[in-house]
Amino acid sequence: MNMQAMLKQAQKIQKEMMSAKEEIDNKIFEGSSSFVKIKMKGTKELVEVLIEKENLDAEETEMLQDMIIIAINNTIKDIDKETENKLGKYTNGMPGLF
């Protein structure tokens, strides 16, 4: 393969990667833990926290905090998983590129 063809191929791959990354960034991911639900953008920006109030007593504040953390962390894992699924073919498993 000559240098020009390699450059064209690299540009094509870069374009595909950027498109896949943009798709992930614009997607809304949802996570939940017991009576807490969250929505987060693919950029890992938290956009919504929903709490089912009927299940919450005033004394359950600490548990609520834990449930929010779990829901957020689960959603971040989903975003990371989808990012790896969509972009892993370009990075050959090299972590941290996106």
Question: Residue ranges of each PLM-predicted region?
Answer:
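Residue-level signature of catalytic and energy-coupling elements of molecular machines
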Residues: 10, 44, 68
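Long amphipathic alpha-helical segments used for membrane anchoring, targeting, substrate engagement
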Residues: 1-30, 78-98
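Stable alpha-helical structural segments in soluble proteins, enriched in small hydrophobic residues
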Residues: 67, 71-82
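A short interface-forming secondary-structure element
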Residues: 49-61
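N-terminal intrinsically disordered, cationic/polar leader segments
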Residues: 29-50
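Short amphipathic alpha-helical "recognition" segments used for binding
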Residues: 18-20, 58, 69
